[in-house]
């Protein structure tokens, strides 16, 4: 019987995410919040919800709930775009900066603990294999 690699990878992602969520709980944030805030920081200022959804790799309706939560927490603001009233621009608030630093510290320390005992060469090898798997999957997906 062949190795259930897909199941193993899915389980790894699930437990990694659960640990991140557990460690972000004192900040009343989740990994989904962190990924969203991280991408807002990486994109040029005041990106649209559509651009943010594309950067994260999710559909815009899936993003709206997370943005609602971040807005309720006072970490972002959204305003209507002057050129396209259907589009909303996203901006981090001043109070988001210290929270983002704290979240990044939690994420970085957790990642370091998870990777403890694994060499840089092993990490690079794993990253290369994951990239090959992703490439193969995308090629198969695009063929069908």
From Swiss-Prot:
The gene is slyA. Belongs to the SlyA family. Pfam families: MarR. Transcription regulator that can specifically activate or repress expression of target genes. Residues 2-135 form the HTH marR-type domain. The keyword Ribosomal protein does not apply. NCBIfam families: PRK03573.1. The lineage of its organism: Bacteria, Pseudomonadati, Pseudomonadota, Gammaproteobacteria, Enterobacterales. Keywords: Activator, DNA-binding, Repressor, Transcription, Transcription regulation. Gene3D superfamilies: Winged helix-like DNA-binding domain superfamily/Winged helix DNA-binding domain. SUPFAM superfamilies: Winged helix' DNA-binding domain. Residues 49-72 bind DNA. This is Transcriptional regulator SlyA. One of its GO terms (molecular function) is DNA-binding transcription factor activity. Homodimer.
């Amino acid at each position: 019987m062949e190795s259930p690699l897909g199941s193993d990878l899915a389980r790894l992602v699930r437990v990694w995410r659960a640990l991140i969520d557990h460690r972000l709980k004192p900040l009343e944030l989740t990994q989904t919040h962190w990924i969203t805030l991280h991408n807002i920081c990486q994109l040029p200022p005041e990106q649209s919800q559509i651009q943010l959804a594309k950067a994260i790799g999710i559909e815009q309706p899936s993003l709206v709930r997370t943005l609602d939560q971040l807005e309720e927490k006072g970490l972002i603001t959204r305003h209507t775009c002057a050129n396209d009233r259907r589009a909303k621009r996203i901006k981090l608030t001043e109070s988001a900066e210290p929270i983002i630093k704290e979240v990044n510290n939690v994420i970085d320390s957790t990642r370091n603990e998870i990777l403890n005992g694994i060499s840089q060469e092993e990490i690079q090898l794993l990253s290369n294999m994951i990239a090959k798997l992703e490439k193969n999957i995308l090629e198969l997906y695009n063929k069908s």
